[in-house]
């Protein structure tokens, strides 16, 4: 496979052997969402995330779109620049999403917007992901998604519903909105999850999810940024296989 790069083939074969020997009941999947389980390009057009669709399509208002784009233009280059220290990037991401959530709520984000974005937007499930989800479901292998999605866990739930793949073995750890009786966003629960603090988003802090995976020590980790590796922080795994999707900054990410 010309598009597949295995850094250490001998090490990979040993880990694969341990996965096989342990069996399916010792495996769980830990995955990012945007551009990991979704496509990076659709019809030749680059996609970013569900929240980027909200900016792009004026679902709320032109004022929101303008302000949100200004935030993205300022902070996204910092997000993907691995030459900037982790602490600086973490601080910048926290600033970005604190401001963005305040903007979303002030601008009138409604739960109905999530359904519109997923129904009408260009974000699509990654090729092969449906088959993976079916396999995991059929063999009762837990899939834990840790996502910094700006539209939160509700949007991921609706996305999988669209593809009829919101299975009971899928567990989502993401930002959580509180909605009023009319579906308007009132606040986002703390702590805010962003791409740079997944090392602080420890699965043990979610006991209902942790009990499903605590004895499944062989972990397959899926992500599209260097920082996604931090999702496994705090989990006492036996064997870890990491799969990274090189969506952008390919040379820098390969060196890392």
Language-model features: locations:
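Acidic, Mg2+-coordinating phosphoryl-transfer loop and its flanking beta/alpha structural elements
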Residues: 145-152, 218-256
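Residue-level recognition of the N-termini of beta-strands and the immediately preceding loop/turn
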Residues: 27, 169-170, 217-219, 240
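Short, surface-exposed connector motifs at secondary-structure boundaries
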Residues: 134-143, 212-217, 238-239
